[in-house]
Amino acid sequence: MIQGLKDWLYLFNSGQDFQSYNRFGAHEVSPGKWSFLVWAPHAQQIKVVGDFNDWRGSPLTRQGETGCWYGELAAQKGQLYKYKVVGPDGATHEKIDPYGFGFERKPGSAARLLDIPRIKWHDDSWLSKRSKWRPYAEPLAIYEVHLGSFIRDTHAGPDGGYMTYQDAIDKLIPYVKELGYTHIEFLPLMEHPLDASWGYQLMGYFAPTSRFGDPADFLRFVDAAHVAGLGIIMDWVPGHFIKNTDMLAQFDGTPCLLYTSPSPRDST
């Protein structure tokens, strides 16, 4: 079990923890063993289904009155998984992990076992410059871009002809530098199922979309941009909440992660 889980769940439930991604979701606790923690207070039962158990389901254990469910399973990095949730009405639905760090390529929606990536950063000079930056006294020019349509091969196959994060290092960064911009602002890069939404209907709040590569690839892009003297701004849209039945809406059989009002103003 994660060290100090009971104490941490107390902090979470009392609103005293602000880095829940370090606990919730899937994390490798030892080589070949992963922990799974999910908040679903109204669920009757939760199982983890994935490549590591032939999608048959391994039950999680309810953690008292915390609303959380926890378990540890033998699994390997890169394998896919979902939660099978039995709601208060007895209906069962497969759901994505709200804290997944990565997902399979569309049209699939399973989360992928990935811990927070670690890369070698080269942007010390940029960070030092940023700490001294005077935003109201120095030039600021922002290039806003939707990476999925910046350069795209419309005749490509099932991969959609998307640029990769590496392509963006090679093509986008020099282009923006040549134009004289100081920052790149991305339209939402978090995981989303529908291309036409431009990323504004989120499913993975903690995962850069797999359309362009894995999370480590994205970090390398940010590093390369900083080395080139460019800041990165992310358009993050937590209010745009996808309602697909296998995602976050009615997650535990109730709108526990969503407004209870059916008004279209409250969610998308």
Question: At which residue positions do the language-model features occur?
Answer:
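Hydrophobic faces of well-ordered beta-strands that scaffold small-molecule active sites
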Residues: Y143, I184, I232-M234
